């Protein structure tokens, strides 16, 4: 026993010096970073998220989880140029062709990072994603991202959707602390086989604790509210159907229309911030050039207004704390320039958006969001519209298939406007459909697509004779004539003296829930569970022999 022990001790003594001399990465543990505050934007209008500094930028927790209309695509002004990311506060540069790992200890969420963030238009970055993919990811981070040549790259990790969802549910005023590990090496290891930067013979490994506090939560509310606006050749607006909180208004010497366009809630921990700016921007460059700054104005209370002029006028975060809405004023000249440019029959979500700029974070501080409400702007001469009688963009229904169950009914208002009544008005329903036994049916599907269930559908309206006319309309994309509907006529006179009329009627789209054919799938199998479908209703009008 004593001999064996001696041999073991000798072997240990021989091996130990070799182990002690082995090369390794250089590990640096930085002092804890100062705690930082962030503002979280929950965008229910566009279904995405945005996080931005409430104070100092570093350590970074900044950017959106989705591209917006401000994404830079290689030309024009550079606004949004990367998706959201984090770093340890030192903004450390990376070496070309080296490998990079980033992982979190005490991560607030599983799978927090997707890869190496880069600026999308820099050489070596992906213009579409602003992401350099790693060889692998796990519950803590990503590994084996090769630093491409070209533009600068830094130790930045792109945030996953799971990270944003964690930030969303955090109460305002709460904090989290995580340890960020960032490691780069020139060794060409295979991360997909389990190798890691920290285990290589050379490189630099940085460790730092960072703390972030949720200082505010801005929730942009999609009200789904809808309103029609008809404009004449001089730009004078006339409100049609809808509930988007609009009214005619005069501001100074300009008359026009003002509407509540954004609804929001803003919770804070008392944060004071003036670097966050919010303002509207016209999406059509020709229209933006044609109108004056005061032809479009915006307000937090509907009485005190600021002109729209790129980034020159804005409301700050601090100003937004005392309100819950943003109003927009459109002058008659604004609408007149739309007419002159041939911009008509347009949705305001395609006409302008709101921009969010945090001047503290120039690379990731740009964001864009849609309005909460929608205006459908149409010419008063020769136009047709259809909107839900609930004044919502996306009406929906749900029900059960069984004997005696009520149909899913959708009501709509159809409006025509012209110098005379339309000579012909047509309507059709489009959506998933299948012909069974010579009849077209709307097809509802399960989430996995395995169950496809046929449903009959009808369009009906009251005729001028007081009778109800019903069409079989199984989502078949075929036009039906509704010219003989009972129209309510309202005359109008243009500022030029020309006369015309606005005609309105109602139509109902129904999907019976008690038809026996819906008890089985299109393959004649029984089914159980939930199925759904979406479709559209279209209208068109024709005027003939108009001088």
UniProtKB/Swiss-Prot annotation:
Q: Where is the signal peptide?
A: 1-20
Q: What does this protein do?
A: Part of the ecpRABCDE operon, which encodes the E.coli common pilus (ECP). ECP is found in both commensal and pathogenic strains and plays a dual role in early-stage biofilm development and host cell recognition. Tip pilus adhesin, which is required for assembly of EcpA into fibers.
Q: Which GO terms describe its cellular component?
A: pilus
The entry describes its oligomerization and partners as: Forms polymers. Interacts with EcpA.
Chief localization class?
other
Q: Where is it localised?
A: Fimbrium
For this chain, the family text in UniProt reads: Belongs to the EcpD/MatE family.
Conditions for induction: Negatively regulated by H-NS. Positively regulated by IHF and EcpR.
- Give the protein's recorded name: Fimbria adhesin EcpD
Task: Give the record's keywords alphabetically.
Answer: Fimbrium, Signal
Q: Quote the gene name from the UniProt entry.
A: ecpD
């Amino acid at each position: 026993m004593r001999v064996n022990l001696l041999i073991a001790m000798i072997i240990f003594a021989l091996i130990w010096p070799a182990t002690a001399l082995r090369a390794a990465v250089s590990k640096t543990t930085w002092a804890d970073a100062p705690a930082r505050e962030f503002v979280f934007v929950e965008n229910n209008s566009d279904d995405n998220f945005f996080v931005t500094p409430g104070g100092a930028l570093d350590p970074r927790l900044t950017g959106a989880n989705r591209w917006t209309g401000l994404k830079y695509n290689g030309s024009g002004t550079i606004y949004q140029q990367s998706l959201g990311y984090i770093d340890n506060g030192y903004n450390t540069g990376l070496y070309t062709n080296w490998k990079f790992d980033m992982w979190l200890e005490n991560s607030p969420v599983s799978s927090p990072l997707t890869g190496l963030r880069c600026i999308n238009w820099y050489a070596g970055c992906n213009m579409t994603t602003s992401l350099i993919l790693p060889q692998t990811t796990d519950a803590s981070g990503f590994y084996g991202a090769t630093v491409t040549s070209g533009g600068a790259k830094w130790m930045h990790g792109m945030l996953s959707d799971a990270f944003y969802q964690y930030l969303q549910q955090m109460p305002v005023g709460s904090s989290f602390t995580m340890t960020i590990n960032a490691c780069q090496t020139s060794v060409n290891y295979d991360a997909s086989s389990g190798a890691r930067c920290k285990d290589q013979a050379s490189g630099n490994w940085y460790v730092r604790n960072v703390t972030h506090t949720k200082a505010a939560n801005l929730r942009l509310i999609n009200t789904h509210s809808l309103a029609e606006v008809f404009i004449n050749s001089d730009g004078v607006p006339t409100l049609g159907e809808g509930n988007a909180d609009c009214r005619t208004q005069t501001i100074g010497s300009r008359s026009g229309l003002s509407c509540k366009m954004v609804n929001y809630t803003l919770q804070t921990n008392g944060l004071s911030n003036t670097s966050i700016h919010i303002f509207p921007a016209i999406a059509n460059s020709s229209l933006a050039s044609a109108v004056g700054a005061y032809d479009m104005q915006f307000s937090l209370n509907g009485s005190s207004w600021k002109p729209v002029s790129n980034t020159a006028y804005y409301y700050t975060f601090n100003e937004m704390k005392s309100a819950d809405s943003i109003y927009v004023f459109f002058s008659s000249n604004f609408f007149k320039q739309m007419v002159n440019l041939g911009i008509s029959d347009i949705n305001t979500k395609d006409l302008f958006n709101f921009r969010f700029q945090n001047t503290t974070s120039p690379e990731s501080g740009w964001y864009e969001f849609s309005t909460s409400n929608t205006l459908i702007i149409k010419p008063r001469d020769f136009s047709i519209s259809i909107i839900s009688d609930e004044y919502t963009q996306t009406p929906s229904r749900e029900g059960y298939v069984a004997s005696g169950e009520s149909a899913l009914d959708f009501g709509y208002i159809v409006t025509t406007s012209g110098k005379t009544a339309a000579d012909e008005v047509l309507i059709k329903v489009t959506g998933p459909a299948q012909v069974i036994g010579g009849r077209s049916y709307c097809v509802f599907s399960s989430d996995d697509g395995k169950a496809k269930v046929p449903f009959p559908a009808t369009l009906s309206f009251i005729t001028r004779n007081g009778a109800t006319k019903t069409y079989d309309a199984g989502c078949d994309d075929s036009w039906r004539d509704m010219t003989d509907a009972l129209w309510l006529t309202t005359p109008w006179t243009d500022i030029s003296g020309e006369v015309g009329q606005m005609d309105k009627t109602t139509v109902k789209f129904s999907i019976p829930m008690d038809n026996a054919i819906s008890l089985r799938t299109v393959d004649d199998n029984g089914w159980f569970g939930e199925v759904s479908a979406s479709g559209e209703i279209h209208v068109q009008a024709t005027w003939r022999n108009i001088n």
